[in-house]
Amino acid sequence: MTKKHYICSNCGNISPKWSGQCFDCGVWGSIVEEIISTNQVIVKVGSKQDFDKLSGHVTEQLRIPTPIGEFNRVLGGGLVLGSAILIGGDPGIGKSTLLLQLAASNFASKMNCLYITGEESLDQIKLRAIRLNLTNYNTDILAATNLENIIASIEANKNNIDLIVIDSIQTITTKELSSPPGTVSQIRTCANELVNYAKQNNIIILLSCHVTKDGQLAGPKILEHLVDTVLYFEGDHNNHFRILRSYKNRFGGVGEIGVFEMSGSGLIEVTNPSELFLMQREQNVIGTSIFAGIEGSRPLLMEVQALMVPSNMVTPRRSAVGWDANRLSMILAVLSSRIGLNLANYEVYLSIAGGLKIADPASDLAVTASLISAATGNPVPEHSVFFGEISLSGEIRKTAKAETRIKEAVKLGFNKIICSKFENLTYDFISSVSHLKDLKEIIK
């Protein structure tokens, strides 16, 4: 008799019967059926393993730089032998392009790369390589979806393989399970087998993975725990910018970003994203300001845009693109309570130019400056940048890495820095503010 249980695709919790909501993580509609294989052999006897000392010899983790500098930045300097990297993103965002550019670049002359696709045929891969001008390098390619066949093919050539690309993990299946491709059990089992094999043989493995409509990696949450590094490819299909961001990295920092521009010949690195994001900006535009932000260790200048429209609705709309909508509501409440700027009868729209997403609390001051400018009809001072966190009392608080933010702004020609007076900076071009009342006086 076939046995089955039910597993949550969000957290991996297993339950004996189906329910509409996971009792462990509370997510609705995440419970899926999983067939338990009845021919598994349970081995109860283990083998002894030797202990090691925490103070014992450490094998140095050598980094292998790739030809893609922005990719190296996100990883923390390059690839580490035996590491497993998961790259997620919407379909068509550029994951396959990035992986093919990596595997079929001059990197392939130093490392033996194998590109395995379960989504395309070999001819389709070759045609894409021709379009991206990547046919000069002798990279091995394989079109396969069966896990056992893939591992057997790698095993036969493992002495000539240093890096494996799997595009994508959702298409790989194992004969041990009867469930269809892309299910929780298939993804978990196949990913676990591939990652373990790669680590045992000191091979670098890169797995691509689709994301759900909520922006989460498709498949079980355990997939993120199996790998050493989790990267997300962010961007809008209507925008040519792409952001590669690290969310987990055992060999480097978290939150680092790499910026790319999608072109007809593939992904192009953007080494100075601040200049590119501000290239088409006009001066003295009402409702816009420049935020001096930090993404990982990289300073980045971004344009914040605000628009207000009179509304007859009982509850006017508040919309934020690239920024937290709840934080926008908080800032509007502080403006109303602390400086008497009542926006209850206005629709408020906020957008971060270039398709970027900001989570830095230091963006509060730039957002508030744009809102005050849009509400009063007065532009912010020319050639000015803003950074600072706003408290519920309306005070402007100091932020991390102020010097780094200022240097990036000065490098791009901005000569007026508006930040908290608690930064204790003595530059002549700094206008210190301690409260929202001071900011309102500047924008008039």
Curated annotation (Swiss-Prot):
The keyword Glycosyltransferase does not apply. The keyword Zinc-finger applies. CDD domains: RadA_SMS_N. Its EC number is 3.6.4.-. It comes from the Bacteria. A zinc finger (C4-type) spans 8-25. A motif (RadA KNRFG motif) lies at residues 248-252. Residues 347-444 are annotated as: Lon-protease-like. One of its GO terms (biological process) is recombinational repair. Keywords: ATP-binding, DNA damage, DNA repair, DNA-binding, Hydrolase, Metal-binding, Nucleotide-binding, Stress response, Zinc, Zinc-finger. GO terms for molecular function: ATP binding; ATP hydrolysis activity; ATP-dependent DNA damage sensor activity; damaged DNA binding; zinc ion binding. SMART domains: AAA (SM00382). ATP binds at residues 89-96. Coiled coil: none annotated. InterPro entries: AAA+_ATPase (IPR003593), DNA_repair_RadA (IPR004504), KaiC-like_dom (IPR014774), P-loop_NTPase (IPR027417), RecA_ATP-bd (IPR020588), Ribosomal_Su5_D2-typ_SF (IPR020568), Ribsml_uS5_D2-typ_fold_subgr (IPR014721), Rubredoxin_2 (IPR041166). Has a putative N-terminal zinc-finger, a middle region with homology to RecA with ATPase motifs including the RadA KNRFG motif, while the C-terminus is homologous to Lon protease. DNA-dependent ATPase involved in processing of recombination intermediates, plays a role in repairing DNA breaks. Stimulates the branch migration of RecA-mediated strand transfer reactions, allowing the 3' invading strand to extend heteroduplex DNA faster. Binds ssDNA in the presence of ADP but not other nucleotides, has ATPase activity that is stimulated by ssDNA and various branched DNA structures, but inhibited by SSB. Does not have RecA's homology-searching function. Belongs to the RecA family. RadA subfamily. NCBIfam families: sms. This is DNA repair protein RadA.
